[in-house]
Amino acid sequence: MSQRDKLIARIRARPSEAYFTDVQRLLELFGWSCRKGTGSHRAFTKPGERTITVPIKDEKVKRVYLDEICERLGLDD
């Protein structure tokens, strides 16, 4: 199993929290770009798609946002 597959499996398992770096890596694998900003939110953009805004608290992302990301990327079971 490749690192990409392991990352996707880890996010699809819907933990209560995930590291922001893992979420960022996943979105970038699917062609999204992180728009740098200040504060506690990061915006990911992709041409032709609505922006995904991800709030970060203590370098972690909550499950509700992981659910939205999985739905937008088509990773739902």
Predicted regions and their residues:
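Basic nucleic-acid-binding interfaces
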Residues: S2-T38, F44-D77
